[in-house]
């Protein structure tokens, strides 16, 4: 599992899970509680409690909304995705910075 920390937005991480290949195809572990032991900016553990799937038609723009208690694990299962993240934490040194 490869983790990359954002240089623009503190706390933003990109996770690249390993892909296991064999004669049957590919296997990717999308979530494992033991591997995702993150804390928020106050040092409190982050607990993954909900998993959702969104299926969009071509050229659809969706907005993701968050708050202090919510974090997002975003993955593209098929096709392409263009993700833009904006730091909306008003007390963050990266306030209103964005990354895509």
What are these regions (language model features)?
Residues 1-100:
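Non-catalytic, conserved peripheral segments adjacent to functional cores
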């Amino acid at each position: 599992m490869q983790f990359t920390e954002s240089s623009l937005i503190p706390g933003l991480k990109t996770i690249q899970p390993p892909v296991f290949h064999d004669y049957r195809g590919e296997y990717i572990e999308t979530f494992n509680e033991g591997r995702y032991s993150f804390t928020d900016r106050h040092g409190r553990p982050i607990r993954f409690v909900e998993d959702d799937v969104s299926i969009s038609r071509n050229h659809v723009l969706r907005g993701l909304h968050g708050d202090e208690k919510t974090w997002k694990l975003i993955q593209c299962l098929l096709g392409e995705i263009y993700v833009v993240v904006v730091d909306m934490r008003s007390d963050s040194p990266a306030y209103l910075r964005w990354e895509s």
